């Protein structure tokens, strides 16, 4: 198969320093950038915790977790900095308007969103992702949101999907699995609003391709996905690839310590925080991968390749970002 013509490169230390967010002396939490994370399900509350910890350590001014009420007592002691939006229970097919009304209160003030870590692979998760991205039936009068600003009143945001705010969204894990069940979902979304972060299995479901083809031709598949979906793609693997269909970046280093549950949740939270601070889709994805690889190598020096767990990564990523800030 033939790749379309595009620019190919690597994202190195100089690129990382150049893209790193910088805070002004008068910054406050909302000017830095808040991120809303829609994550967690029974048995997967840790995904929400890891994603939120990573977002905070990567510089988000505020982290808001959209979760179900029963998970809050488990999450709050571990991530006391987070605030919460309580998701409604029950069949969202009949309550999607209530969901959007609930989420809108905090979403209107956030600069980026993360959807998917640990949401579960069930009808509720699929309905949730569909409603949040505006793919399901929309309330009368809701549009694709051109011209909305953070200064608008809360009432101006009632019933809007996350896309209505014209802010970037990371779709990860079960968010990707939900999209894979919706025919032609991409034609209903604006271009270059999402960073999709699949591993090989999730990409197989998104593209309806066998995993062996993705492993054999990862660059072609990543580019094809970016062009089909008209979004930015971060295909995890060896190498990890970042592309918007016009440029392709390869992260050649692949620390074996990252082969651990939760590392993808950390990456999603890191990218969400970087997007909230104003980075482009491609720069946020690249810097998230770069810092995550550096953090893993730092941890391997002390813990080896076997002893690193995902909970070690957020602080190590913060240390790597601090080193870039001093460079």
Q: Model regions: which residues?
A:
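Glycine/charged-rich beta-loop-alpha catalytic/anionic-binding loops adjacent to active sites
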Residues: 31-37, 246-257
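Short glycine/serine/threonine-rich phosphate/pyrophosphate-binding segments
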Residues: 43-58, 62-64, 122-125, 176-181, ...
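Short, small-residue alpha-helix embedded
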Residues: 205, 260-291
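Charged C-terminal helix
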Residues: 294-327
């Amino acid at each position: 198969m033939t790749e379309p013509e595009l620019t190919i490169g690597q994202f190195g230390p100089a690129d990382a320093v150049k893209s790193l967010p910088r805070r002004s002396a008068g910054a406050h939490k909302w000017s830095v950038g808040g991120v809303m994370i829609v994550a967690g399900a029974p048995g997967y509350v840790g995904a929400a915790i890891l994603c939120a910890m990573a977002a905070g350590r990567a510089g988000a001014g505020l982290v808001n977790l959209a979760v179900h009420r029963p998970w809050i007592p488990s999450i709050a002691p571990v991530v006391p900095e987070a605030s919460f939006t309580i998701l409604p229970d029950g069949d969202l097919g009949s309550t999607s308007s209530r969901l959007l009304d609930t989420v809108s209160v905090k979403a209107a003030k956030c600069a980026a969103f993360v959807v998917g870590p640990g949401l579960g692979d069930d009808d509720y998760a699929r309905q949730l992702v569909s409603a949040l991205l505006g793919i399901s039936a929309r309330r009368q009068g809701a549009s694709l949101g051109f011209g909305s600003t953070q200064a608008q009143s809360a009432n101006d945001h009632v019933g809007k999907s996350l896309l209505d705010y014209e802010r970037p969204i990371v779709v990860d894990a079960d968010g990707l699995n939900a999209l894979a069940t919706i025919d032609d979902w991409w034609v209903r979304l604006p271009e270059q609003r999402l960073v999709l972060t699949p591993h090989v299995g999730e990409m197989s479901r998104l593209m309806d391709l066998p995993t062996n083809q993705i492993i054999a031709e990862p660059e072609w598949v990543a580019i094809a996905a970016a062009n089909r979906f008209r979004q930015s793609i971060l295909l995890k693997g060896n190498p990890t690839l970042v592309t918007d269909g016009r440029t392709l970046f390869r992260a050649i280093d692949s620390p074996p310590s990252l082969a651990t549950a939760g590392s993808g949740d950390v990456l999603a939270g890191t990218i969400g925080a970087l997007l909230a601070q104003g980075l482009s889709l491609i720069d946020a994805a690249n810097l998230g991968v770069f810092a995550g690889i550096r953090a893993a190598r730092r941890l391997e020096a002390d813990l080896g390749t076997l002893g690193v767990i995902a909970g070690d990564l957020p602080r190590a990523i913060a240390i790597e970002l601090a080193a870039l800030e001093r460079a």
